Structures are given as structure tokens and as C-alpha cells.
């Protein structure tokens, strides 16, 4: 059975499932980072990858985005995200689809799709120091695929929740990804998890525009 509840964060309302959902149904570490993207989303076309229940996507919609597409590999999460879109009266603007993000981004590229903002908030690619090399490959690849979909002058909001992916390693990996897809990046904001989560220097959040 589903353990449904409602959460209200500033202007956005969420249906969550505390019984079946990940991390008690809601990722509180990202709560202020979701608010931070709002100032960049007015009239924007936004792609939110690994959207889960749509938290970043809904904040983009509330901020006045022209259109938002949220993507997640879990049909359970996508169904709840679409419920949340209706819950906030955003169903005509904020839509969610079930896809494997790694496979779906090249499909969007092949279709000639471009976005004003691409959000990447993948699950941890490593939970041990021993597998950090594979994690670096994963972050480099997903950021390459995401960057290809950002319009010139647009924004890439990219996140890592891998404890062993420290700031220097992550930024170097993002830089490598940009070089490989011939993009120039400028960091406009660096953010971490909310203050009610223990701060680790290994945990990084970046917001980058690409041209």
C-alpha cells in the first residue's frame, strides 16, 4: 500500500509516498537548490533529468517556465510526478515521461531538441573510493550528453551526491566533458546541500551556463 502524504515548500506542493518512495519520499537535501533555479527559469524551455517526483521541474514551472519535461527511469516516480504537476495546476506546462536518461538524451539530440536549462541530478555513481574511476566516466558521459542539449547562453544545473566525488574531481570531470563536446563553461553559482544535512567537502552542486 502507498503511504501518501503532502509536503508544502514555499510555492510548490508535493504528493509524496513515505512508504514506497526513495529517502522517505522526498530529498530534503536539495530543498534550497530547487528554489535557486527559479530565477533562471522564467519563459525557459527546461529539461529535468532524473526528476524523481518532479521537484526541480515543478519549481521551474512555478517560476514561469515556458515548458518543462521531466524524465526518470521509474514509472512509479513519473506517475507521482504527473500527479504533482496536476496538484500545482501545471499539467499544461510541466510534463513527465519514463525513459532511461542515458538513452533518451541522444534521442533528443537526434531530434534537434535544445533547452534553455538542463538539470542533471543523477543517483550516486559510486559509494566507495574503489569505484571512483567508473563514477568519473559516468559523470563525464551524462554531462556530455546533457551539454549537447543546452542552447548557446543557456544553463546546465549539474549535481553529484557521490560522497567520494570531491569538488576538484567533479569540476575537472565537468570541464573534460565540456571540452569533449566543444562547449565553454562559466560557473555562476556553487551550492551544497541544505544546512540541516551534515556538510561534507566531497558533496558538490554546481550551476553552470554553457555557450
Segments predicted by a language model, with ranges:
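SAM-dependent Rossmann-like transferase core, predominantly class I methyltransferases
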Residues: 6-44
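Mobile active-site "lid"/loop adjacent to the S-adenosyl-L-methionine
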Residues: 117-145
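C-terminal catalytic and target-recognition region of SAM-dependent MTase-like enzymes
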Residues: 141, 155-208
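Conserved SAM-binding motif I beta-strand of class I
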Residues: 67-72
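Conserved SAM-binding loop of SAM-dependent methyltransferases across substrates and taxa
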Residues: 55-64
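S-adenosyl-L-methionine
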Residues: 79-113
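Short glycine-dipeptide loop
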Residues: 150-154
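Conserved small/polar residues in nucleotide/adenosyl-binding loops
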Residues: 2-11, 204-210
